[in-house]
Amino acid sequence: MVSDIKEYYQCILDNLTGGLISVDLSGRVVYMNPMAGKILHMDEDHKCLGCDYNKAYAGFPALLGVVKEALETGKSVRRAEISVMHANVPLVIGYSTMRVKNHDGKELGVTVIFQDISFVASGKK
């Protein structure tokens, strides 16, 4: 049996093959996994944990819109796409959003899970 369940959960999030970012209801970045940083080309120093998501993801207007809509509407999105630019290269990002609630049903924030699907979207394999 796992001795430290919190560490185990953290390892699961850190080892996801897709990107995951989570923002609390006040708009503060709570978590960004390593793959999210890799997809968005943001290193450890630029994760902005605790920062307002508008500052953290200012270079990605479409991603800002996804987070804003999730926070404002509370609606979950399944399997949608956005385009983001990185170093003048467009990336097609497939994403889903979900509300984060505690065991009592209290809403805590939103999470966006995503992948770079540029090669799939362009028809390349």
Feature annotation, model-predicted:
Residues E7-Y8, I39, H46-V89:
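Terminal output helix/cap of sensory domains in signal transduction proteins
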Residues M1-L40:
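Sensory modules in modular signal-transduction proteins
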Residues D24, M85, N102:
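Short, acidic, Ser/Thr-enriched surface-loop or helix-capping motifs
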Residues E81, V92-Y95, T111:
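PAS/PAC sensory module
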Residues R99-K125:
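Sensory coupling linkers of modular signal transduction proteins
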